[in-house]
Amino acid sequence: MSVSEANGTETIKPPMNGNPYGPNPSDFLSRVNNFSIIESTLREGEQFANAFFDTEKKIQIAKALDNFGVDYIELTSPVASEQSRQDCEAICKLGLKCKILTHIRCHMDDARVAVETGVDGVDVVIGTSQYLRKYSHGKDMTYIIDSATEVINFVKSKGIEVRFSSEDSFRSDLVDLLSLYKAVDKIGVNRVGIADTVGCATPRQVYDLIRTLRGVVSCDIECHFHNDTGMAIANAYCALEAGATHIDTSILGIGERNGITPLGALLARMYVTDREYITHKYKLNQLRELENLVADAVEVQIPFNNYITGMCAFTHKAGIHAKAILANPSTYEILKPEDFGMSRYVHVGSRLTGWNAIKSRAEQLNLHLTDAQAKELTVRIKKLADVRTLAMDDVDRVLREYHADLSDADRITKEASA
């Protein structure tokens, strides 16, 4: 900042690269402005406790996601049930622009069914941590590598994409993981996957593992982060910084337990990093409609503090905040609400309300107030707000009554002097 000698105000100088939160041009491995979203509402999201999507609803969600601009849609394994298989086939026949994937166990029986559904790719997974090797499938690393090799070669022979992922990656032995990924990369998988299945990883652990893996494999790297400890968004961002190429999301973050990286949250974070990339790639003004669609389907309310679309996401209440926002929204907003089809709201009915907000609201109602009058009226509104919550209609009524009193007083004064 520099200080103007004329009036003592500070002039804000833009950062040299235009965005202090943008990608580091010297970091050639970072993919924060060049990544793909694998949208898993119709796979991971089906594992949400309240979820039940019939065929019609799945098709509706798939079309909406495709129109929104996601790169991939991941579907529940066709082996899960007969209806799951039929739904997978139905969505594959829609002719969507995005690629359709299905998620299967590292079994040849699953692979044979999956490749016949018409999907563009198969996501193969098997547990690699000591917990899952002992209590889930009971197999050793030799068996895992052999099974992975067989399944991957089979899927590749059908001419479709294949991703191989470990499950519970961050509680797996690092040497085992790297040996496994090196083996499947040599076979020719399109992607390897890292999964924080229990949500235990920290951003630093994510960054370190992805950077290490990036030096071992030449294929793309997909990441799947659960949100048990509230780190799914930060972990997804750090994965991209470290060189990951694909991130799994679900609408509203729904999934097993308390879910995975929310689609809207990831886009909020990446928008700050590269607004142009995100606004050109995705139809952001459709995000609220997408979230409402899924929220209704699983019978939940969108949280008040939800990223971007929550009722309070662009609401400003404190007087000093409101004054600055009215002068320049960038003072207290890192996201532009209009880019997401949202609106800014300045709260004017509380004990925290400042006179700038009251004057701005009066102007919206075509009521002219001087600064002194706005300050006087603000004192009156604060007194009322100390007693009870004031709705916008309450504030508007007080504004109109005050302005009417001013008009009457002005008329009487003019008549007396005539």
From Swiss-Prot:
It catalyses: acetyl-CoA + 2-oxoglutarate + H2O = (2R)-homocitrate + CoA + H(+). SUPFAM superfamilies: Aldolase. It is found in: Mitochondrion. GO terms for biological process: lysine biosynthetic process; lysine biosynthetic process via aminoadipic acid. It comes from the Eukaryota. Disulfide bonds: none annotated. GO terms for cellular component: cytosol; mitochondrial matrix; nucleus. L-lysine binds at E44, D123, T197. Changing E74A: Abolishes the catalytic activity. Belongs to the alpha-IPM synthase/homocitrate synthase family. Homocitrate synthase LYS20/LYS21 subfamily. This is Homocitrate synthase, mitochondrial. The gene is lys4.
